[in-house]
Amino acid sequence: MELFSDSGSIVENFKERINKLVFDYSLNHGGFRKTYKIQRDRVYYMLGDAHHANLSGKCLMLYNSEKDIFEGLGFKVKGSRINVSKTQILRNYEINFETIIGVEPNGLKTISTAKDVKKLYDIYSYKSSLHPFDDFMAHCINRWGMSIPASLERIIKSEIIKVRSGVLNRNSELYNYIPTVDASFSEMSRGPANVILTDGKLVPDGTCFGPILSKSVEDPRLKNEFRSKGLIMVHDYFILIGESPGPHYKKYTKMTKDNTIFWDPRRTDHKFNNVVSYFKKENIRDVVEYTTDALNRGLKPLVLIDIRKDKPKNLNTPEGAIEWERMVHDDNNLIIDMVNALDKRVTVCAKLRPAFMQVGSMRKLLRPVRILPLPYLRRSTAEFNMFVPNEALMNGNEIYDVTYDDLVRMSSEVFVLKNIIGGLYNMYLKDMHLNLGVVNKSVSLSDGSSAIWSLSNINNERISNFNFNNFLYAAPYSDFATSSVKRHFKGRNYSDWCLNILDEVNLKDGVYLVPLYAIVGGGQITSHDFVNAIITDQEQLIDFTQSERALSTQVVKLVSFILKDSFTAKGLNWTEIDNEIRNRRLSSLSGVGFTVTKMLDGKVLVDGKVVTVSGHMLYILLGSILGLPYGIKKYLKEIELNILKPGSSYERGVGGRVWHGLISHYLAVDCVIDVIDEYMVCTYEDRSKLNVVLRYVKSKLLELGSKYDVYLSVDERLVL
C-alpha cells in the first residue's frame, strides 16, 4: 500500500490533475457538452465538466444564453486573454491596507492614488549606479531570471562606444526600422536568441526568453507622471516647483490646498496653494520653512522640482548654445543648493540635465542620491531623475559624487538601450520608479497589513499564528501533510511555505482561509487559483451564501470527478468505494442507539427520518485534505447560515429546508477517515495531525447541534 505522500500515489495523482485544469469555453459545435435537464445543474457541474473537457482535449461548448453566467464565475472564451485575474483582484484590494509587504508593479499602480499614506516594504532593491546598462542586465538576471543573448549584448556595447566617441549622432534615430513597442512583459520577453548586424541592419534569429528588438515609447505626460507616481502614496505633504501644467496631479485626491504648494510662473487650475512666480535662490529658505513645519506636524514631505528656463532664441548659434549650457548649469546648481539645505527626512525628486560644454562643475552634494533614467523620455534627450530619498527610503545604492561627464556617459547608454531594446527597458524604468517609495527591508505580518506571496518564501520563517486584525495573507496551498512546495515559473524556481487545512483549523474566530477561485470581485480563473489561497478577516472578499458572486460548491463535483479518475488510474472503482463506505457508516448507527431502516427504494431511515451522508461535506473536507482548498471554516459558516435561513443550494435547487442534519455531516467526516485509512495510508505523525483536523470539524458540527434543534431533526424526504 502506498503512503499518502508517495510519488505516484492517489494523492499525488489528484494534485497533478488540479494543476492541469483549464477553464475555457467555445460557442462552436464540436466542443465538450453534457446534457442536463435544468440550467442550474450545468452551473453546478461546470468545474467537473471542465476537467472532463480537458481530458478529452476539448473545451466546454456553451450556448450564447449560458456564457454570461460562466464568464461571471471566471471562465473565458477559448483563445482569449485573461483580462483580470484573481491575483489582480487581490492586488486591487490592497489599497485598503496601510502596510503592504512585498510589492508588484501593477499593484503599486493600483494603490498609487490612495488617500492615506502607505507603508511599502520589499526586500528586492533596484540597483542604480552610474552605469545604466549594467543595472538593467543585473535586474534582468536577479528579478526576471532573464539573460540578454551574448550577440545582442555585444551589439549594444558597440553602439554605446560609437555614441560616446561621436561617430553616431545622438540626435539621429538608431536603426529606424525597429518598431516602437509598449506591450505586456510576456510579449516583450520573446526576443531573438541571436542577432547579426548585416548591411547596417539587425537580423534576429531564433527565439528565447529575452528582450525583443524595440524602441521605447515617447510620452512627456507619462514621463512626468511616473517620475512621482511611486512616491506620492507614501508622503502627505507636497511642494511642486516648476511642475506646470501637471495634469496627472488631478488623479491624487489626497493632494489639496492644505497640503500642496504649487510653485510655477504659469497659472494652473489646480486647487492647490498656488505660488505664481519664478523660483529663485532666495526662495530656498521658504521651502526649508514649509518642510520643517510639516515635519514638526508629523507629516512626510515630498519636494518635486522641474526647474527649466526657456531656451534662448539664438540656440543654434555658438553663443546661444553656450548660453543654454550655462542656464542648465545654473538650474542644476540651484537644485543642489536646495537639496543640501533641506532636512534629511525630506524626499526630493529633481530633473537633472547634463551640460555638454565646459561651463563649470556641479556643486558638491551633501546628501546621497540616485541618478535614474526616466521612462517615456524622448529617446534623443538627455535628462535624469535625481532622486534624493529620505532616511527611511535609502537602500545603499546612493552616491554623493555626480559629474557632467557621468551624466553624458549615462545618456549614451540610455540612448542605445531605448533604441534597440527600448520596450522592455522602458518597462524596467517604470517599475523602478514605481518602487521609489518602497522601503527595502524585511518585515513581519501585522495588524493592518497585506502580504501577497511575499512572506511565504522558504527563506522566511513560516507563519503559523495569524492572530491579526485587518490583514490579508496569500500563499500556495497543498495537502495537509505538506508544509512547503517547489514551483517553476518563467524560468525561475520558487520554494514557498504553503498553507494547508491544519493552518485553517487553528485560526481565530472571524479569520478564514479562502481559495483564490472563491474570492469575490470577478476575474478569470486558472489552475493557479485552485492551488493558492488567502487567510484574511476581510469578509468583503468572501461569499458565505453560495451565490453566483463566486465559485463555491461547484468544487464538489470537481473533487468527485478527479477522485474517480485518480482511483481509476490505480485500477479502483471510486463510485463503488464511495457508495460502500457511505452505506457502511449509515448502517453503523444501528449499534449506537439509533434505529436504522433501509427502505425498498434504497433510502435509509434513521429514527424514522431519511438521512444520507452529505456528499458536500465529504468532498469539501476530503478535497481540502488532499490539496484542493475550499475553506472548511467558510463551509461551516455556510451550513450555519442555511440553518438560520433555509433556502436554495446548487445541489438541491430551490426550496426551503435545511440541506443536511448533524448526523449527515458527522457521518461524512467519518467517511473521510475511512477513505484516508483504507486508500491513502499516513505516517503516524501525519495521522496524528489529521486527527486534529477531524476533531475540529466534528466539534464545530456538535456546537451547531447544541445551538439549533432544527439541525438535529432534518428529514431529507421533505421536498425542496
From Swiss-Prot:
Keywords: ATP-binding, Capsid protein, GTP-binding, Methyltransferase, mRNA capping, mRNA processing, Multifunctional enzyme, Nucleotide-binding, S-adenosyl-L-methionine, Transferase, Virion. It catalyses: a 5'-end diphospho-ribonucleoside in mRNA + GTP + H(+) = a 5'-end (5'-triphosphoguanosine)-ribonucleoside in mRNA + diphosphate; a 5'-end (5'-triphosphoguanosine)-ribonucleoside in mRNA + S-adenosyl-L-methionine = a 5'-end (N(7)-methyl 5'-triphosphoguanosine)-ribonucleoside in mRNA + S-adenosyl-L-homocysteine. Signal peptide: none annotated. One of its GO terms (cellular component) is viral capsid. It comes from the Viruses. It is an enzyme of class 2 (transferase). Its EC number is 2.7.7.50, 2.1.1.56. The keyword GTP-binding applies. InterPro entries: Seadorna_VP3. It is found in: Virion. Its main location: virion. The keyword ATP-binding applies. One of its GO terms (molecular function) is mRNA 5'-cap (guanine-N7-)-methyltransferase activity. Outer capsid protein involved in mRNA capping. Catalyzes the last 3 enzymatic activities for formation of the 5' cap structure on the viral plus-strand transcripts, namely the RNA guanylyltransferase, RNA-7N- and RNA-2'O-methyltransferase activities. This is Viral guanylyltransferase VP3. It comes from Banna virus (BAV). The gene is Segment-3.
